[in-house]
Amino acid sequence: MSDSLERYQEFTGLSIDRPDEGLLRIVIDTPGKLNAVDATKHANLADVWPVVSRDPDTNVVVVHGAGGAFSAGGDMAMIDDIMADPRYRAEVFREARDLVYNMIDCSKPIVSAIEKVAVGAGLATALMADISVCGRSTHIIDGHTKLGVAAGDHAAIIWPLLCGMAKAKYYLMTCEPLTGEEAERIGLVSMAVDDDAVIETAMEVAARLNAGSAQAIQWTKLTLNNWLRMAGPAFDASVALEMLGFAGPDPVEGVAAIREKRAPRF
């Protein structure tokens, strides 16, 4: 590992390399599980961004999933632990806030390449990126209310700004999935492209940013993200209510329904 990447050694479950000078690539990598996010990855997806922000060798970041999928969200073992252990629930509350705020505060522009599926913590990472490139048939869903908890993670801070309150309420309350094509139509993602062109397009966007004025681009991000910072209190409340929900009976039924592949009976 080169000296410029040694700072990232601790972030297991994330494959991190530098395909070009000034460009950092972060790949969520869970073989055979559509890059589901376990406890370690959840922590690392929160903690990696301050390191990126301080990295003098990085001008821009591309984040995507391994094997042609972004992420299927939190794995069931992690959800079981959140429900069972109040101390771990408090830790996940901190990590969920850190993931969002650390991406907002990361000085470097972040480009997400969203392939096949994006759910849960994976969706949070995908949509909190500064520019999101999505496959037309990519499956996007915020499944919190179907699980039996409030839509926390990232939803309250970013969906209303991206697609408007009416669409945000509809998709977050109903858990209706949407395609990348529909996500682009309502403004949830920056652009939708052919499924086989997602990574290539994201890298092209990153190359344009990498060739630009780093200071001007970083200060533009800093300025625009003040809109997100103003939504911080609503976001904090949403994550707190999500965690409160995990202490109740509804997610027990929600998890059982997922495992038994049936509709939940709340």
Predicted feature residues:
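Conserved CoA-thioester-binding segment of acyl-CoA-metabolizing enzymes
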Residues: 1-66, 101
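Acidic, divalent-metal-coordinating active-site segment for phosphoryl/phosphodiester hydrolysis
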Residues: 176-182
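A general structural signal for well-ordered alpha-helical segments in protein cores
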Residues: 76, 96, 156, 165-168, ...
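Short loop-to-helix capping motifs
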Residues: 30, 55, 85, 212-213, ...
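Glycine- (often His-adjacent) and acidic-residue-rich active-site loop
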Residues: 65-102, 118, 148, 230
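C-terminal long alpha-helix characteristic of the crotonase
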Residues: 133-138, 189-237, 243, 247-249, ...
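CoA-thioester-processing core
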Residues: 99-105, 113, 119-173, 186, ...
